Amino acid sequence: MDALVMAGGRGTRLDTDGEKPLSPVAGRPLIDYVLDALDASGVASVVVATSPSTPETAAHVSAPIVQTPGEGYVADLDAALADDRLARPTLTVAADLPLLTGAVLDRLRRAHESGSLTVAVPAARKHELGVSVDTTFDHDGRTVAPTGVNVVGGEPSRTLVVDEPRLAVNVNRPGDAAVAREWLRS
């Protein structure tokens, strides 16, 4: 399975002067943690999706780049997935998950059976950790939040809910960065 890192967002909620994927957490850029996790996983290859908003990120990474139009997550995802270097199913990972590990990614890849997979965590877990919850949806009577990790394949599409703190901490706001720093230092 190939992997696509989504690294084209402006990161306006993070309130940083620089590009979000390069925002430091515990002394390292966010995207470096994600790329290290992918390197430690069993993915076949990694492509990074950047946009006109993230030229320094494109220069920073050594992985192949696909330039997207910077028109929002869904439009950029569609543009990136059209790149012929990515075979379906494709593991997609947001660049703002500094606690991610290769072992967690491999568990998710093994959980993928066919089609597409949306990976979510209980919203209650995010609240317990003290990180922001911007989007939620109901799944089997539980309020869950998307993690920023998915498998894009086709139909059928299913949701996998995992109570994994490493997937619950995505850095969208300054408080999220503080929580991630504490985890990385412990």
What feature does the model see in each segment?
Residues 1-18:
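N-terminal nucleotide-binding beta1-loop-alpha1 segment
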Residues 9, 96, 173:
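Active-site glycine-centered loops adjacent to acidic/histidine catalytic or metal-binding residues
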Residues 24, 30-94, 137-139:
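Conserved N-terminal catalytic core of the sugar/cofactor nucleotidyltransferase
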Residues 7, 50, 94, 120-121:
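Short beta-strand/turn micro-motifs composed of small residues
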Residues 60, 100-186:
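Conserved core of the sugar-phosphate nucleotidyltransferase
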Residues 3, 88-91, 117-119:
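Generic beta-sheet signal
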Residues 18-24, 166:
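Short glycine-enriched, charge-decorated loop/helix-capping segments at active-site entrances
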Residues 13, 54-57, 99-100:
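Short, active-site-adjacent cap segments at secondary-structure transitions
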